[in-house]
């Protein structure tokens, strides 16, 4: 690590974090070193932001597990809340016409998909690939009992096309790794100028135009009056690239995609080893010692 990078790290005021594949290990648990280091950052006055493709309701539960009080940027930045109880900093949703067009294209594709709006996840085409239902939706239908999943999952086409397409933050097409259907979908929707990303090799995410994790970092820096050069961001997948590019100190996980590592200034150890926490303790928190 260069002296220049060390000097920049000493000035970090905001830590922006992806969740899956970054803060979480492969068993969807948070390594103790990650919890400990983030709590220490918070105690020392640094701002924390969880920036994920996950829903706000789920991220709120994750923040509790981590024992921190971060800003929550859900659905890749479509909804940004100052904390568990708000207030709302920024919110971007599809228009009804946009949502109908995306939903119709997804239905016609024959791919399993989800639509996310406040407090609800609507499932589309569940009968097409029933094996994907339990993997991605956990329970069909009804409210998930696990307190980390406090939102209603809806498996009802009438409700999807009724209430479900008002105020949608994100659509997600789900399939097997590198499903060719993802590219076909993106091509069919290319003239809508949507924001498109992938949180894994098994999905393709569609958000309103201009919404991505980099947008979330920019919004937070304006809100908090923090220069982007004083942001350290951690990520592993291609949907994290805009966030890393918006941060002065982009950190990619060792388990991350090569394209993500290419934009990083620092590589963190594997997520299963608590790579985020190890980097924070070695390079950010030690400045106070």
Positions of the model-derived regions?
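Conserved acidic, metal-coordinating active-site core of Asp-based
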Residues: 105, 109, 116-234, 243
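Anion (oxyanion) recognition and catalysis
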Residues: 39-43, 107, 190, 245, ...
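Active-site phosphate-binding/coordination module
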Residues: 29-138
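Short, structured coil segments at secondary-structure junctions
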Residues: 66-68, 75-76, 84, 189-192, ...
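Short active-site oxyanion
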Residues: 45-49, 69-70, 170, 229-230, ...
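Short, acidic loop-to-helix structural element flanking the phosphoryl-transfer center
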Residues: 28-44, 91-98, 153-157, 208-222, ...
